[in-house]
Structure formats: C-alpha cells, structure tokens
C-alpha cells in the first residue's frame, strides 16, 4: 500500500552551539592526550555557561605535557570556533576554565585490561585480552538515500549547518555569529524522498541586522540555494520549499550566554537524525576503549559495507556488550524487507567478516589516533568533508564472497 505525504524531520547544529562547544572541547582534550600517549584512557565531560568552562572526568595517561596543557587546549578550541570577543557573548581568551579530572576507576580498568575471556576462561588470543569498557548496545545504519549512504534529512541538515559556518568564517556573511541550528522536513512516498517541505535556519547574528531585508535573503541565496545546488538529488523536488529564518524574530544572544551546554547532549544529531535507533551512549570525550564510541563506529562500518555490497538497500545493525567481556553478547540485523539475500545469512556472515571484539575494532579502524576533534560537529557518519576510517568500503568484496 502506497504511503503518501509522510513528513520526516531531522536537525543539525553548528559548532558554536553550546552543546557542540562542549563536544569539541572534550574531543580536543582527547586528541591532545592520544597524540602523546595512544593508550590514554579518557572520559572527559565539559560544561559551558556564561563566562565559564568546566572540564571534568577520568583520565589515565602518560601524556604529561598534554595533560598539563588542558587549559590552553580548551581556550584554543573555543577561539577556533569563533568565540573571541565579549561582543559575541563568549571569549576563549578570557573565560574561566576549571579543570577537575581524576584517574580511571581501577575496577573498570581491570575489566578492560584483562577481559573475562583471559582472566577466567584462559583464552590465549591477544584480542581476547581487552574487554568492553562498559555494557551497552550500539546501532549502525546505512541507506541508499545519498551517495554517502545516510538518511537524506540528516545529511541535508548537516550540509546546511556546515555551510552556515563556512559563510561566517570566510567572511561571505561576516555578521553571522557562531551559534546556529538547522532543521529539514522532507516528504516521503514509499520510503523515497520526493519533496523538501520546510527548512528552518536559526542563526546568531550581529545586533543591527534586518531579518527580512538582509538575513533571510542572504540565508536563502548563500546557504540554502548553494547547498541544494551541490546536493543535486535525483528524486527531491525543491521548487516549493518553505524557508523559515530565525522564527523568533532575532537571535543576538547566543552561545554559552544564551544557554548552558553539556557534552553528549546531541547524540541524535551525531548519528542518524532520528531515522535509525540509538543505543543511548554519547561519543565525545571518550577514548576507543569505550564501546559507546568504537562499537557505534564499527556498526556504521558494517552497515555501510552491507549496503555497498548490494545485500540490502538499507540496513540497521545492533551489537551489545557486557563490561569486561571481549566478545559481543548480541548481534541483530534488520533489513526492512530490502535484502537481496536471506537476512539470516547476512546476520550469520557479519561476525565472519567483521571482528567485533573491542581490541579488533581498534586495530582494524586504527582508532588510537587523534582523529576525534573533527567529528565533534556536523555528524560522525556520512561525512563528505573529512575522511573517517569507519566510512571505508573495504569489506564489500569479502561480504559478496561470504554470501
């Protein structure tokens, strides 16, 4: 039965959004530590509010210089985002930075360093030695909506947010400020995106900017039209799109002065925009021994390769772990009726092609590197502006052979 007129919405935010400032700070601290000590154990949470940054968590590392320089790392990232003046409501050079970081719990460390398989079962494989850093469930997803195999609403929302930042930093629209949000509503027929219904852009701006005569036309021409021209989607009608710019009327007070921010509060923005399920774990500030992060990346890798191999047009995969255990305790594959082979067979070959033990994920995706700060805004998946290891299509042939 045909389903018409269904509207699905996803949102994105810019790097100047308060929650994203926190994600960026947490991941910048992580990268600084990994650059000096790839085996660093890091769990860093950040809070920002008017004039203040608080960085807390647990860290075990030999990167003494990077650890001692965390305050400067925080300031540099805030300034890079664009908060460099009290006129913008926040200044990385003069804000208060408070650090409260302790060591990783030894009870957690023992389960990660010596997994149950090694400690109790006597396993000799080195990859059985590293246990999951926590229990939990993680999802991965891929779909043929876009070349990057992401749901179109979140892919388009991210492109708009990135463009907002580009026109601000390049001086095309110099009156814009760092804080901003985008939202995209798309009409679907039988799971095919057919029409771009509504785009909402809320962007912080200088105080003297006219909404109707300056901001709205500039956003339409320099942001929306540019992104749509670049997107060039085959089935999407954009001729009647409604654009709403700053529906409150103005957006002068923004960033941490407008709202407090916290690490890990944009997990749907970070993943699939609500189109796929989420296990609940945030990414930023966590080293790859935390399966919240590394296993979610691995499952995106699995899903994307399944779709690229032609085994399904869209797929969602779930993995689950017990703390201190190396082997997953659960694996689930859902193809939504789009599989070209028996879905049971897909589920069977996934663990044959992909080693989902934490140590193997870290090895195969080369995750002990300072690559995380670039993921802190505009999504962790389907990125078209940076190369990320979990986006590689290096298992397609192996999957085809396996079926």
Swiss-Prot record:
Keywords: ATP-binding, Cytoplasm, Magnesium, Metal-binding, Nucleotide-binding, One-carbon metabolism, Potassium, Transferase. Binds 2 divalent ions per subunit. Pathway: Amino-acid biosynthesis; S-adenosyl-L-methionine biosynthesis; S-adenosyl-L-methionine from L-methionine: step 1/1. Its cofactor is Mg(2+); K(+). It catalyses: L-methionine + ATP + H2O = S-adenosyl-L-methionine + phosphate + diphosphate. Its EC number is 2.5.1.6. Mg(2+) binds at residue 19. ATP binds at residues 17, 179-181, 250-251, 259, 265-266, 282, 286. InterPro entries: ADOMET_SYNTHASE_CS, S-AdoMet_synt_C, S-AdoMet_synt_central, S-AdoMet_synt_N, S-AdoMet_synthetase, S-AdoMet_synthetase_sfam. GO terms for molecular function: ATP binding; magnesium ion binding; methionine adenosyltransferase activity. Residues 104-114 are annotated as: Flexible loop. It comes from the Bacteria. L-methionine binds at residues 58, 104, 259, 290. K(+) binds at residue 45. One of its GO terms (cellular component) is cytoplasm. The keyword NAD does not apply. It is an enzyme of class 2 (transferase). It is found in: Cytoplasm. Its main location: cytoplasm. Signal peptide: none annotated. One of its GO terms (biological process) is S-adenosylmethionine biosynthetic process. Belongs to the AdoMet synthase family. Catalyzes the formation of S-adenosylmethionine (AdoMet) from methionine and ATP. The overall synthetic reaction is composed of two sequential steps, AdoMet formation and the subsequent tripolyphosphate hydrolysis which occurs prior to release of AdoMet from the enzyme. Homotetramer; dimer of dimers. This is S-adenosylmethionine synthase. It comes from Mycolicibacterium paratuberculosis (strain ATCC BAA-968 / K-10) (Mycobacterium paratuberculosis).
């Amino acid at each position: 039965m045909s389903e018409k007129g269904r509207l699905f919405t996803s949102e994105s935010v810019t790097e100047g959004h308060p929650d994203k400032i926190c994600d960026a700070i947490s991941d910048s601290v992580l990268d600084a530590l990994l650059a000096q000590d790839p085996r660093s154990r890091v769990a860093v949470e950040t809070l920002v509010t008017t004039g203040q940054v608080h960085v807390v968590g647990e860290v075990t590392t030999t990167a003494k210089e990077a650890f001692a320089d965390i305050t400067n790392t925080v300031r540099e990232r805030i300034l890079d985002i664009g908060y460099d003046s009290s006129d913008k409501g926040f200044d990385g050079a003069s804000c208060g930075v408070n650090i409260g970081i302790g060591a990783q719990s030894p009870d957690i460390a023992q389960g990660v360093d010596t997994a149950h398989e090694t400690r109790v079962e006597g396993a000799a494989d080195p990859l059985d030695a590293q246990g999951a850093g926590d229990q939990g469930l993680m999802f991965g997803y891929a779909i043929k909506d876009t070349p990057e195999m992401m749901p179109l609403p979140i892919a388009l929302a991210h492109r708009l947010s990135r463009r907002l930042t580009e026109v601000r930093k390049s001086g095309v629209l110099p009156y814009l400020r760092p804080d901003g949000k985008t939202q995209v509503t798309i009409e679907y027929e039988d799971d095919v995106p057919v029409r771009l219904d509504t785009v909402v852009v809320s962007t912080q701006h200088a105080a003297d900017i006219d909404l109707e005569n300056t901001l709205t036309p500039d956003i339409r021409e320099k942001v929306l039209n540019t992104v749509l021209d670049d997107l060039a989607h085959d089935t999407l009608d954009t001729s009647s799109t409604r654009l709403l710019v700053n529906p409150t009327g103005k957006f002068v007070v923004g960033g941490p002065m407008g709202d407090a921010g916290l690490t890990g509060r944009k997990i749907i923005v970070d993943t699939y925009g609500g189109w796929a399920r989420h296990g609940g774990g945030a990414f930023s500030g966590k080293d790859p021994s935390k399966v919240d992060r590394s296993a979610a990346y691995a499952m995106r890798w699995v899903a994307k390769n399944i779709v690229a191999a032609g085994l399904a047009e869209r797929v969602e995969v779930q993995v689950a772990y017990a703390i201190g255990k190396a082997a997953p305790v659960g694996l689930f594959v859902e193809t939504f009726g789009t599989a070209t082979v028996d879905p049971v067979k897909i589920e069977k070959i996934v663990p044959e092609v992909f080693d989902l033990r934490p140590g193997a994920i870290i090895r195969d995706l080369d995750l002990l590197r300072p690559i995380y700060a670039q993921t802190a805004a505009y999504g962790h998946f389907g990125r078209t502006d940076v190369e990320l290891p979990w986006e590689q299509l290096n298992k397609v042939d192996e999957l085809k052979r396996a079926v």
